[in-house]
Amino acid sequence: MPKLKTRKAAAKRFRQTGTGKFTRRKANRNHLLEHKSTARKNKLSHMAIVDERDEERVSLMLPYL
């Protein structure tokens, strides 16, 4: 059976934790940051866990993680 290809766009966006879950960045922290509060920007800077309903799709895009 041939090797499976990794989706490079997904490989740049997701990381796998030690327990096998996937982490992702939160949206809304790239530009237009002047009017957003410091607390809001700080909360957006932390990594989020990918929802369990999306985990299967992410794992199919990243077969070797």
Curated annotation (Swiss-Prot):
Disordered, as annotated region: 1-28
GO cellular component, alphabetical, reads: cytosolic large ribosomal subunit
Q: Does DNA-binding count among this protein's keywords?
A: no
A Gene Ontology molecular function term of the record = structural constituent of ribosome
Q: Which Pfam families match?
A: Ribosomal_L35p
Q: Name one GO biological process term.
A: translation
What UniProt keywords are attached to this protein's entry? Ribonucleoprotein, Ribosomal protein
**Could you name the domain of life of the organism this protein comes from?**
Bacteria
Kindly give the SUPFAM superfamilies that the UniProt entry links to this protein: L35p-like
Do you know which PROSITE patterns this protein is assigned to? RIBOSOMAL_L35 (PS00936)
Gene3D superfamilies referenced in this protein's UniProt entry, alphabetically: 4.10.410.60
Q: Transmembrane segments in this chain: where?
A: none
Family indicated by similarity: Belongs to the bacterial ribosomal protein bL35 family.
Which NCBIfam families does this one have? rpmI_bact (TIGR00001)
For this entry, the protein name equals: Large ribosomal subunit protein bL35
Upper classification of the source organism reads: Bacteria, Bacillati, Cyanobacteriota, Cyanophyceae, Gomontiellales
